[in-house]
């Protein structure tokens, strides 16, 4: 369905405010709409507006595409007036308010929007696509025209082979890190072919990128962008060597980890893939994966495989607790198999006690204790 709608939701009488349909003008790029819009505020040319930010959606050519190739629709980011439905701004690879030459793959996931100074107005957008790319778009509130929003591709984790044709169907989770001299936004996301959950060819991964450009300005006062990060600039944390009992192995891992732009984990079980957004809480990353059943013969068959839950350190991908209760914290403690079959939904958090929030993965829940120091800081 190439349309978007927004309604006034009253207790008894909800009503549709407007409907947006793709196919012409600036909305030619609007594909199948999969994700929830992000509702926020921006100051556009001195006027504060309620806005709806959405990705361009999905191009169903991705359903059976084994190699990475440009999409016809979906490769856009739209900002609409949330009160009237009018298009305020959009980005794509051409014929847009912000042309980004690398924005050539569809964007079905939710746009992650950051209000860095808690003034109610959005400042940054993080955008992931089905080409395995990640973009950051920066909003300069109060400006207009070409000065209103700038952006760039900041990572490319896809490739041009069947094995490296990684796709992001879901938006990242993002949090600010300020530890001594280290200032960056931690951007966490995982790859997986949602349209073909039973695929076992693509080598999918989970990534945590350190985006330091949001703390640096150029001579014109604009936020900076790192040169596009690829896996070669990331630390492969799969072996859990940073916590090795072997001193030499640990030292080599620490040297390899130093000055990297983040880390990633190979999803090593055959066909394992991420099919939901992660959740960052208390400097830990929760995410789920899906492992297809080996015996299935149809790429479109109902999912009957299993799901796994990961809990890792946001800083380095290490395990953070003794999950299997064997008295040691090692690589095996990153993940646990879920009882539920099929594809697990996104991680949700329920907060009744701020120190012990409950994290739920579908129907299975666990308490996540947040450590607080004597000054009350977590």
Regions found by a protein language model. Name each.
Residues 1:
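Glycosyltransferase donor-binding loop in the core domain
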Residues 4, 8-378:
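Beta-propeller fold recognition
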